[in-house]
Every structure is written in C-alpha cells, then in structure tokens.
Amino acid sequence: MFKQVIEKLTELGKELGIKTVFVQDIYQINNNPDISYPVLVIESDETRETLDLWQYRFRLTYVDILAEDQSNLIDIQSTGMELLSKLLRNIPENWNLTSSSYRTFLQRFNDECSGVYCWITLEVSKEDIC
C-alpha cells in the first residue's frame, strides 16, 4: 500500500501541473542540472500499523525557482500552498487525512528556490490494499 500511496500522490501532483517529482530525497534537486520546475518532493517519515489500517506520515514539498530579485517569493509560496491543498482535496475518499500543516521556505539548491512544505498524516484501511 505504501507504494500505491506514493504513486497516487505523484499522479495527483502531475495532474496539477508539477513538472518533476522526486521521492525520498529533496537534495535530488542538486543532482539534476536540467530540472524542470515546479518540483514536488514526496518524503516519508513515520509509518504506523494497527490491526485495521496503515498510518503514513509524509512531507510534501513544493519547490519553484526564485527570480534573481526575489520578486516572486510570495507568489511561489502562495501557489505552493494552493497546489498542495488541491492535491490533498483530491486524495481518494477512503483515505483519511488526519492532519496537515504548512511552512514556507527559501533555499539554495543548484538554483535559488522557494516554496512550501506540508506535513501530512494519512490513514489507509488495510482493506484498501490491492
């Protein structure tokens, strides 16, 4: 089910206009000199199991390239929040989003970038496993 969750998050991001998706390592941005922005990074954190469900915690990060004068800083962060919010509204109805919190950032990778990351917790019933 873990793989299915990551694949679905990737699919939803691409449907919303994300050009590049990385899984598990935000610093892959530095290893790709010809990267296409915006980028979505899906990183797993803690996974818990109960008798009936899997509980996954992820950090979803939206990254876009910053103008030299940083004039698009707030636009990038605002767009990132809106995109991540839309992504979360489109997760399957049988997945329970129990929490989400957002934080903006400014970061130098190979490019000067800005964006927002969102910690989420999803509960997925074991009955949903294909």
Identify what each model region corresponds to.
Residues 1-24, 28, 41-130:
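Charged, amphipathic alpha-helical segments and their flanking helix caps
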Residues 33-43:
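Low-complexity, acidic Ser/Thr/Pro/Gly-rich terminal tails and inter-domain linkers that flank the onset
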